[in-house]
Regions:
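Hydrophobic alpha-helical connector segments
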Residues: 56, 71-103, 167-174
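Short amphipathic alpha-helical elements of helix-turn-helix/winged-helix folds
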Residues: 14-18, 35, 94, 177
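Short, solvent-exposed beta-strand-terminating loops
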Residues: 99-120, 176
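Amphipathic alpha-helical packing segments from all-alpha helical-bundle domains
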Residues: 82, 86, 112-158, 169, ...
């Protein structure tokens, strides 16, 4: 079993290198076999097809992502708000250093959105649906976010985050903001843009806005009371 796991890892690591350098579409299973020095037949023994291999890669991505979230949550001497702030920095750093893995995570989110609806589920490649790794991902893809929810809950308890916020809704809102923030680093980093902003100024601005929202310095305005007469 250890030898088999090692071969699976060799194939997966080779796939990550080739998907990163050549792109997913341009990479063939034979390229991966050649990269790892293994017969094509043996490669197919461990992974049924490229789609199955990519789902295995996605599972690896979620496992590493969960480790990032766990490490932030378990860090000592920090408030919930400080942990959320650290998490933003860690996610962006993870995406920068492991772009193919981060992209796989975002791609899976799109797949789940399609999977949830019977009509759009038909648009998913059947080879993906057949992958045991895809089925496993359906079970575990919320696990990283569970640590984020616990960070928000901690912040509410320690007073660093507004007490009226609901932990699950709050974290998934934060999570969607982080995804959008990471995506915008490309456009704001483009030299030909006309807006006066760059990645170096966007990150501290994003963090301050997020902190202010969670601390409650940005309060929703209450509608003014309108007094009326019955007569």
């Amino acid at each position: 079993m250890p030898k088999e796991k090692n071969k699976e890892k060799l194939i997966l690591d080779a796939a990550i290198r080739l998907f990163t350098s050549k792109g997913y579409q341009a990479t063939r299973m034979s390229d991966i076999s050649q990269e790892v020095g293994m017969s094509k037949g043996l490669t197919y023994f461990y992974y049924k097809n490229k789609e199955d291999l990519f789902m295995a890669l996605t599972k690896k991505a979620f496992d590493q992502f969960k480790d990032e979230f766990r490490e932030v949550y378990l860090s000592k001497g920090k408030t919930g708000l400080e942990k959320i702030t650290d998490l933003v920095i860690r996610v962006v750093d993870f995406a920068s250093k492991n772009q193919i893995l981060y992209d796989a995570i975002i791609n899976f989110m799109d797949l789940v959105k399609k999977y949830n609806q019977e009509e759009s589920r038909k648009e998913i490649d059947p080879l993906i649906l057949e992958s045991q790794h895809f089925q496993k991902l359906l079970e575990i893809h919320h696990e990283p976010a569970k640590f984020g929810v616990m960070m928000v809950s901690q912040g509410i308890k320690d007073g660093s985050i507004r007490p009226e916020l609901q932990p699950e809704i709050t974290f998934y809102t934060i999570w969607s903001m982080i995804i959008g923030f990471e995506k915008m680093l490309g456009p704001v980093g483009y030299d030909g843009k006309e807006v006066k902003i760059n990645p170096e100024s966007l990150q501290p601005g994003f963090l301050k806005l997020l902190q202010d929202m969670l601390k409650g310095t940005i309060q929703a305005s209450k509608p003014a009371t309108v007094q009326t007469s019955l007569f």
